[in-house]
Amino acid sequence: MARVKRGVVARARHKKILKQAKGYYGARSRVYRVAFQAVIKAGQYAYRDRRQRKRQFRQLWIARINAAARQNGISYSKFINGLKKASVEIDRKILADIAVFDKLAFTALVEKAKAALA
């Protein structure tokens, strides 16, 4: 049976990992064994954080809506409840944008929510 020389394949695999680790600090970008672990861990963090990003943005939107709603004399939960009763179907992302960039429109939404609750 002929001998299999895998130097080309190994070199390509190592180059691929070291390319992915470019920009990492110290040995993490130069030593294959360390770089491999760093790339694997980076992938795990990226996977986890893609899911966490969605939660974090929702938290941010809710915090912004709550702050704007309280400036208009209503709590977040009552505001959302009022919008549901008034059958206003605007998601939290858009509500947060309105709260930040268009105060008058947000005040109108608050009045609509208050009217639906009364």
From Swiss-Prot:
Alphabetized Gene3D superfamilies for the sequence: 6.10.160.10, Ribosomal protein L20 (1.10.1900.20)
InterPro entries (alphabetical): Ribosomal_bL20 (IPR005813), RIBOSOMAL_L20_CS (IPR049946), Ribosomal_protein_bL20_C (IPR035566)
A GO CC annotation given for this chain: ribosome
Gene Ontology MF terms: rRNA binding; structural constituent of ribosome
Entry keyword rRNA-binding: yes
Disulfide bonds: none
One Pfam family cited in the UniProt record for this chain: Ribosomal_L20
Superkingdom in the source lineage: Bacteria
PROSITE patterns, alphabetized: RIBOSOMAL_L20
Swiss-Prot/TrEMBL keywords: Ribonucleoprotein, Ribosomal protein, RNA-binding, rRNA-binding
GO process annotations (BP): ribosomal large subunit assembly; translation
Purpose: Binds directly to 23S ribosomal RNA and is necessary for the in vitro assembly process of the 50S ribosomal subunit. It is not involved in the protein synthesizing functions of that subunit.
Protein family according to the UniProt entry: Belongs to the bacterial ribosomal protein bL20 family.
UniProt name for this protein: Large ribosomal subunit protein bL20
Native source organism of the sequence: Enterobacter sp. (strain 638)
